[in-house]
Every structure is written in C-alpha cells, then in structure tokens.
C-alpha cells in the first residue's frame, strides 16, 4: 500500500473505483460519485476551508475558496480520470489551478479525496509548510503546476494538451481560471493557439464569481459578453450555474463528448458561496474568519441538503 492510500478523507484506502475495476480505461474517476454524494463532499470541503483560513498566520482567500468548491468537488469526485494513487501515472488527467490564490479550497479538496493527510491543513501558510499560500508542486502531492501569477495556467495547459496530442495520449487537461484573471492578455494568446491546434482535450473552466480584490469585475475590467469572446477565439462554449452540482456534472460530461475544438465552461458562481455573511462581499477576497465568525460559518455548514 502506498503512503498516499493511508490518508483520511473520502478515498478510504481503496485503489479501485466504486464499480470495482482498476483504472485502465478512459473516463475512470476514483470515485464516480453521484450528485448528492458530491454535494456532501463539497459541504465538508467548505467546513475545512473555514477552519483552514481561520488558522492561517498569513491570511487567505476565503471568498475564492468557497466559490470554487462545487467545481472542485465535481472534478475530483466525478470527472477527472485520476485518483490519489495515480499522481505519477503519465495517463492521468491533469488539473491546473490557474487562480492560484484559491489554493486553500484545492488543498481542502485534495485532503477530502485522500491526496494529502487532513492533518496537513492545520499548517496552511505556516513556516516551511507543505501547504503554501499558492500552489507549489514540489511541496504538495496532487499539485500539477506552480501558479499564483495570474494568466500562467492556461498557457501551460495549452502546451500540455498539445504535448498529449502529439504523443498519442488520451489524457485531458483541465484548468480553472478566475474571471478577473482573464484581464491578463496571456490567456487570450493561449486561447488562439488552442483553437489553431484544435485541442479538444483542453477544458477551461472560468469561475465567474464577478468579484476580485478591488471590487466588481464589471467595473474594473468588463468581460461581457464573455461567451462571445471565447467563441470568437475558436472555443466551444458552455455555461451553467457553477454552484449547482447537477448542472456541473451534466455540462462537464456533455463537454467530454464534443470533438474538434477546445472547450470552455463559464461557471456562474457566488463568491463566498455557502456562508451567508461572506457571499458576494468583495471584502472577503482576502479576509479570513475570526472569533465568532468561525463558529457562525461552521454552524451554517453543519448540515447538507
């Protein structure tokens, strides 16, 4: 048994999928959870997001962590052809967290899925921690790319998708960007290249929570009509409620069946989703819960649907 299989979380030391088959064919996720199971994982991830950020000595990005939670849970517990025992498998799907400031949510997801021990979450952003404030693949199992400087994830994802195509690999490359991040021109240069090479193994997900550090994205650097922009750059465009697991599952699985062009999902989310006093509040971009806020947030997240 590998060391990774001993970690706590939903993985539960099982190297096989719920269908009882080893991971050899296309579209084999380690869990293949249904929507209700994914929602429960998202709830548990959100609880850890609150405690992780509250204990951080260097702040955090609570709002961004919470807006992306349903997307991450859907990817890791249903969509990605990978699992915690396959982090060195050359045929695994690759997930890149381009919005690196939201890594707290990703760490909580990785812990829940068994990639890292849940005990590590208490060391988030502490000195010499294995969980730094932005993704570092040399420190954290399951992290595929060092990010944080916005606009870098998609260009690298395009390169990985092209390399996979040239080598005959069936792997898919997924990348999550923020909507504010799309003001970076490097994203659009990469998008042009993805369309030129017809990279239908590339899946971009935009966490469109409409807020960034300084306020409303629509006021700082308007993006809309975002669907028209992506289509003009040669992408097949999908949209859904990015905090609705049923919609995420349906849309992402439908996207996997399309061929001939790179894909983008515009996921309409609420920054801070799941905690009423954090939702849609720009000040929570770089705020963490303290004192009574922690218990109040956890109380709201005590029960699933």
Give the positions of each predicted feature.
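Thiamine diphosphate
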Residues: 142, 146-149, 154-257
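N-terminal capping segment at the start of a domain
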Residues: 41-59, 207-209
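N-terminal amphipathic/basic-hydrophobic helices that include classical n-h-c signal peptides
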Residues: 1-27
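Cofactor-binding active-site loop characterized by glycine-rich and histidine/acidic residues
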Residues: 56, 66-196
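N-terminal hydrophobic or amphipathic helices/low-complexity stretches enriched
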Residues: 23-45
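Glycine/aspartate-rich loop-and-adjacent alpha/beta segment that forms the canonical ThDP
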Residues: 245-305
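Glycine-rich beta-alpha junction loops
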Residues: 70, 101-102, 209-210, 244, ...
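Generic beta-sheet signal
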Residues: 93-95, 171-175, 202, 261-269
């Amino acid at each position: 048994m590998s060391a990774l299989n001993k970690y706590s979380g939903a993985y539960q030391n099982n190297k096989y999928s719920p269908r009882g088959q080893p991971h050899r064919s296309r579209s084999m996720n380690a869990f293949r959870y249904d929507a209700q199971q994914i929602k429960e994982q998202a709830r548990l991830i959100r609880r850890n997001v609150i405690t992780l950020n509250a204990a951080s000595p260097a702040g955090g990005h609570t709002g961004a962590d919470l807006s992306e939670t349903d997307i991450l849970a859907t990817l890791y517990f249903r969509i990605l052809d990978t699992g915690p025992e396959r982090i060195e498998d050359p045929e695994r799907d690759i997930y890149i967290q381009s919005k690196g400031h939201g890594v707290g949510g990703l760490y909580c997801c990785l812990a829940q899925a068994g990639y890292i021990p849940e005990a590590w979450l208490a060391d988030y952003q502490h000195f010499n921690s294995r969980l730094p404030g932005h993704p570092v693949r040399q420190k954290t199992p399951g992290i595929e790319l060092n990010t944080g400087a916005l606009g870098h994830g998609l260009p690298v994802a395009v390169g990985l998708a092209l390399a996979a195509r040239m080598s005959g690999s069936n792997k898919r490359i997924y990348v999550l960007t923020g909507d504010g991040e799309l003001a970076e021109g490097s994203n659009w240069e990469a998008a042009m290249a993805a369309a030129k090479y017809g990279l239908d193994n590339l899946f971009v997900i935009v966490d469109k929570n409409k807020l960034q550090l300084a306020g409303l994205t629509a006021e700082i650097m308007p993006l809309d009509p975002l669907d028209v922009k992506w289509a003009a750059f040669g992408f097949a465009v999908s949209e859904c409620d990015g905090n609705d697991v049923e919609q995420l599952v349906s849309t992402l699985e439908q996207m996997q069946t399309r061929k001939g062009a790179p894909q983008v999902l515009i996921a309409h989310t609420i920054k801070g989703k799941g905690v009423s006093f954090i939702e849609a509040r720009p000040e929570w971009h770089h705020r963490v819960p303290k004192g009574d806020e922690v218990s109040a947030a956890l109380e709201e997240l005590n029960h699933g649907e």
